[in-house]
């Protein structure tokens, strides 16, 4: 009986802890960012990242901010259109996040262009978005002052500036 109660308590405590933005998330270009895929439902996002998120009040789209601690900047932003993920991107410059071929947040611009392949550069307010489109998905590598600041996924042929 004690073992069953202990197991129940551990499961109760561990479940919410597992649902949070990843500390060292991964970009799979054209597919996922931090385990989130375009088209997922809001319920799937909450199951993966938890219920602790801020809501952007001034954004055109419904936007949730999953940060590591309340009112901090680093984490993951998720935009929803009709309760489905239409964009997902890192917030601020979360350490430990990576993309294939050893590309990590903080890499210099030349590493991004070498490792991510041919990219289209768009100028945003205060940063640049180096992008690559597939048929359905655009992958963005956000550059600030010559360094990789973050990653993003959104529908192909949309504005990557956020």
Annotate each PLM feature.
Residues 20-27:
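Cleaved targeting-peptide boundary
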